[in-house]
């Protein structure tokens, strides 16, 4: 039996899943704080769930890199400006790239324990607003010494335990599983093609709430706002998907000499937020609310930091072992494409057919907004199960430092 955390949920459902567009960093959303992006997604999620803010009994929110000076209050502000009562507590959750999945796990746990019947989940990230930071400035700088300001976004990709960065962990997996540059580029090209098709068909638009210039108010508190720049009136479309033939990707230089990972076959840097309401199933049924899917189980595991990207494989294996399902029972997988080689290594380790994986494109094509990714993937998965009429799906991601996390969800209409 695999080791790690496993939880099963008897009657927990997800509603109103939604996200903002995923927009390339330094793009149209780059000046907006993750808090305001989170508020935007939260308000729309509650609306799509057929609820009001007063119906929410818990706020669970995640944000990795501070994008503003009020980040400490991120979950609280998201709740207040989404109309959640002031008496309702809010919690900041952090499991790096697994944060969005962890929000679902914690919500299920709270509901199963009887702490609440309803929870609002919000993940938001501004890669653009990652700070340039120094951690030793309060004690002063010596005359003539180098000032230690560094790019938080770049430095956070380094794992000081094994002494390597995240791209190098993918290179380790490429060597371990015999994955070639050609395979990685082909996988990336496919991801782009699937995302473009999903965009052109209107599928992705169904989970997007356009970002517009607007004001958010909370009674008795200072108003917040989003103001788009220039002549923009709305941002409604993911910006990164584009057809990317293998021949074009093959021309890009590898990040590390002799390696397989490039800027074209790794996850895109984007700014975005995603939100979902999670409730007790009986609560939703009694009120006739539009359920997207049942959250059936969650798993979390640890793996060696130097091959952190393999994390989804043991997390998914644990999920299947403890739930009594087989790999073949799962119709759709959404596994975060942190790096192309990393995702291919997970598929090879599991023996997973690629035609069931990220069928609407993945993070290589769409982007990886850290704390928002798990919510985005799980919402996309629920919508894809509904569209295809399939029953079971798993969403999953690797986690920097060496972890894996996975969620099992069920389309109740196909049960």
Regions found by a protein language model. Give the residues of each.
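Conserved active-site "lid/cap" helical segment
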Residues: 2-78, 82, 86-89, 97, ...
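Conserved catalytic cysteine-centered active-site region
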Residues: 63-119, 149, 160-166, 243-268, ...
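Active-site pocket-lining segment
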Residues: 168-171, 204-207, 214, 296-365
């Amino acid at each position: 039996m695999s080791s790690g955390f496993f939880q099963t949920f008897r009657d927990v459902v997800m509603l109103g899943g939604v996200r903002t567009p995923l927009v390339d960093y330094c793009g149209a959303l780059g000046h907006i704080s993750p808090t305001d992006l989170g508020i935007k997604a939260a308000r729309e999620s509650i609306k799509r769930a057929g609820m009001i803010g007063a119906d929410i009994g818990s706020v669970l929110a995640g944000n990795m890199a501070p994008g503003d000076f009020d980040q400490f209050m991120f979950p609280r502000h998201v709740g207040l400006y989404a109309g959640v009562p002031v008496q309702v507590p809010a919690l900041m959750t952090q499991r790096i790239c697994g944060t969005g999945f962890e929000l679902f796990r914690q919500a299920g746990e709270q509901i199963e324990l009887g702490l609440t019947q309803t929870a609002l989940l919000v993940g938001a990230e501004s890669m653009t607003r990652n700070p340039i930071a120094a951690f030793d400035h309060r004690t002063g700088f010596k005359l003539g010494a180098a000032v230690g300001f560094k790019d938080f976004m770049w430095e956070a990709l380094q794992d000081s335990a094994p002494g390597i960065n995240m791209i190098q962990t993918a290179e380790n997996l490429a060597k371990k599983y015999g994955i070639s540059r050609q395979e990685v580029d082909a996988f990336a090209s496919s991801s782009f093609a699937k995302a473009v098709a999903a965009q052109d068909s209107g599928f992705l638009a169904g989970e997007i709430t356009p970002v517009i210039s607007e004001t958010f108010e909370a009674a008795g508190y200072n108003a917040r706002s989003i103001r788009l720049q220039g002549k923009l009136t709305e941002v409604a479309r993911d910006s990164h998907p584009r057809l990317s033939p293998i021949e074009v990707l093959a021309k890009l230089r590898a990040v590390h000499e002799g390696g397989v990972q490039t800027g074209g076959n790794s996850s895109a840097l984007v700014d975005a937020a995603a939100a979902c309401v999670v409730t007790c199933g009986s609560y939703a049924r009694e009120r006739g609310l539009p359920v997207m899917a049942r959250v059936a189980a969650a798993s979390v595991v640890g793996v060696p930091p130097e091959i952190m990207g393999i994390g989804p494989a043991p997390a998914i294996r644990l999920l299947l072992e403890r739930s009594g399902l087989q790999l073949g029972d799962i119709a759709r997988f959404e596994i975060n494409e942190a790096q192309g080689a990393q995702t291919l290594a997970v598929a090879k380790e599991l023996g997973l057919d690629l035609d069931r994986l990220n069928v609407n494109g993945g993070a290589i094509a769409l982007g990886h907004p850290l704390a928002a990714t798990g919510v985005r993937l799980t919402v996309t998965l629920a919508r894809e199960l509904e569209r295809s009429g399939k029953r079971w799906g798993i969403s999953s991601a690797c986690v920097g430092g060496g972890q894996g996390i996975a969620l099992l969800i069920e389309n109740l209409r196909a049960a």
